[in-house]
Amino acid sequence: MRLESVAKFHSPKSPMMSDSPRATASDSLSGTDVMAAMGMAQSQAGFGMAAFCGKHELSQNDKQKAINYLMQFAHKVSGKYPGVAKLEGNTKAKVLQVLATFAYADYCRSAATPGARCRDCHGTGRAVDIAKTEQWGRVVEKVCGRCKGVGYSKVPASAAYRAITMLIPNLTQPTWSRTVKPLYDALVVQCHKEESIADNILNAVTR
């Protein structure tokens, strides 16, 4: 069972869950099986499970839990980022909260997010390669140049920067780009890593 099935489980079309064809109905996962598997996955990959469930609007509580996990991670690695490491006390905590909140919002973004779908590829991640299409006389596609193949626009890092300047008024754009934004980017990546970990664990416990 993969993580995608967790979202389906919360509004199932049938009482049995399965990602692939099974030999018999008894080979499918019952609701009890799924809940038990989710519990095991949450105990081993709480961050990833909370991140995924929050992203799919399964629980507002999971959203906040995911941001809290992300803040803990940010605090742990903040020493690597000069623009954050030098901050003290309450200011640092607030900056980490802002970074975690914006990073989680970026992780949650998809082509289904209102207003986020790429205008060029309409969410497919693919666009017509005009030059090659004319050269070969048939439609040739390429990775969409606007969205880089993801099908949607990311949360602008500039929005996080503006929010941070409310806490650090003298933070310039160049300093942000060099010393703070790398942490923001790392937080987005960490969300995807934690989801992957949770997905692997859930798959392992349901084999």
Swiss-Prot record:
Cystine connections: none
Start-end of DNA-binding region: 171-192
Superkingdom, taxonomy of origin: Viruses
Binding site for Zn(2+): C118, C121, C144, C147
Keyword line: DNA-binding, Host-virus interaction, Metal-binding, Transcription, Transcription regulation, Transcription termination, Zinc, Zinc-finger
Claim: Metal-binding is one of the keywords in the record: yes
Disordered, as annotated region: 1-28
Keyword set includes Zinc-finger: yes
Site keyed Interaction with host rpoB: positions: T101, A160, T165
Function of the protein: Mediates the switch from middle to viral late gene expression by associating with host RNA polymerase (RNAP) so that the latter can read without pausing and through transcription terminators preceding late genes. Competes with host factor sigma 70 for binding to RPOB, the beta-subunit of host RNAP. To join the elongation complex, binds a specific DNA Q-binding element (QBE) and interacts with RNAP that is paused during early elongation. Participates in the lysis-lysogeny decision by activating the expression of the late lytic genes.
Homology family: Belongs to the phage antitermination Q type 2 family.
Protein's name in the database: Antitermination protein Q
Organism, scientific name: Salmonella phage P22 (Bacteriophage P22)
